[in-house]
Amino acid sequence: STVCAVLEEMSARSVTIISRKGEDNYNNLDRHADAEVIVNTTPVGMYPNCGVSPVDLSLFPKLEGVLDIVYNPARTAFVLQAEKLGIPYMSGLYMLVAQAKRTAEVFENRDIPDSETERIWKKLSLEMQNIVLVGMPGSGKSTVAARLAEKLDRIALDSDAEIEEKNGMSCAQLIEKHGEAEFRELESEAIAALGKRSGAVIATGGGCVTREENYDLLHQNGIILFIDRPVDALAVGGGRPLSSSMDALRQMEAQRR
């Protein structure tokens, strides 16, 4: 394959192909615990089936880098684990752009400088990346999202609005009727859908940070920004049953930081 050829050209000491049924397979990965580079050439983790990884990178303590040929989402579960483990990584978008450059050179019979690959990759990465806003209830996430979207010519999305549209009642009503735990499940479902989008500004509910799984859902295609406002400047009440008083907000802020 292309990946094997490139690795051999780069003087890799050895290249092992893992398959489902071959001699080297997913049931005996421990044979290769000394692997220094892993390249995912499968579609595992690709949109719309995000959130799954072909291997657990923690099984490879000597890893120095990983590459995923998948480019949507920008950060697959495979890449997100590498990021958490501090392992250098690259997703498939750069490879896609490089392939397009070479195709254009062949069809147009001209040379295109390598700097164009870098320029287009950076441009596409920025355009496709979501801007995700998190913060305390009443910190202005929805307002800031709308203004950012207008300024940057992007679509503004809101996880609370998504929940309300899907369930036919307000977030406050859902919490009062079903309790906070069930509401958080609905919130994660909404975030899972929004996190697969690209090029949007996403405002999240104040409590989305209480569930660790939401981080990966939002970060797979986005940069996460925290709107940090003093507790005394936050809006109290306003249809938010969990932040009905300043004392409740202060306690919430202490728990969520």
Model-derived regions, located:
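A glycine- and Lys/Arg-enriched "phosphate-lid" helix/loop adjacent to the NTP-binding pocket
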Residues: 220-257
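ATP-dependent small-molecule kinase phosphotransfer cores
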Residues: 158-219, 250
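NAD(P)-binding Rossmann-fold cofactor-contacting core
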Residues: 9-26, 160-167
